[in-house]
Amino acid sequence: MTVGVLSLQGSFYEHLFILSRLNTDHIQVKTSEDLSRVTRLIIPGGESTAMLALTQKSGLFDLVRDRIMSGMPVYGTCAGMIMLSTFVEDFPNQKTLSCLDIAVRRNAFGRQINSFESEVSFLNSKITVPFIRAPKITQIGEGVDVLSRLESGDIVAVRQGNVMATAFHPELTGGAAVHEYFLHLGLE
């Protein structure tokens, strides 16, 4: 197994660090050749419109979507979740990969100054994770499993088949529970 981390923009170094700690083969994905070498992909947090522009300019956008639709496991954090969604409520014309049947609203938990940490349940354990200009999942389709919610009831982690996403940034905590789950996605 080789995990790729889309490394065009955003918090990709932090994901690479977690994968190193887990002794997992991993590479940065910046080109189509890089993408062809991976069996899983992480799309990091960052700025979703910048990430969209860079994936289109690099020629990776359609290739990433094709690989996901062919069954490659993928995990998107924050902006990565926006990229994977089917609809962005506050930017209805924003192009997405449309691989995860959810609607999202960008920056729904507030601006940078409103960033916060919260304890969430994730697979029978409690983890404390940061929400930084985080998107909110406003609607989920059939076949989308909820993995985690805030106390308010807001859904903050989901999975649909080979695709998972979180509104939060587990890569910034040093904990590896979410990444470990992703590494087993599709193997169960």
Curated annotation (Swiss-Prot):
Catalyses which reaction(s): aldehydo-D-ribose 5-phosphate + D-glyceraldehyde 3-phosphate + L-glutamine = pyridoxal 5'-phosphate + L-glutamate + phosphate + 3 H2O + H(+); L-glutamine + H2O = L-glutamate + NH4(+)
Residues that hold L-glutamine according to the record: G46, E47, S48, R106, I132, R133
GO molecular function, one term: pyridoxal 5'-phosphate synthase (glutamine hydrolysing) activity
Listed GO biological process terms: glutamine catabolic process; pyridoxal phosphate biosynthetic process; pyridoxine metabolic process
This protein's record includes keyword Lyase: yes
Function: Catalyzes the hydrolysis of glutamine to glutamate and ammonia as part of the biosynthesis of pyridoxal 5'-phosphate. The resulting ammonia molecule is channeled to the active site of PdxS.
Family as reported in the entry's similarity comment: Belongs to the glutaminase PdxT/SNO family.
Name listed for the protein in its UniProt record: Pyridoxal 5'-phosphate synthase subunit PdxT
Native source species: Tropheryma whipplei (strain Twist)
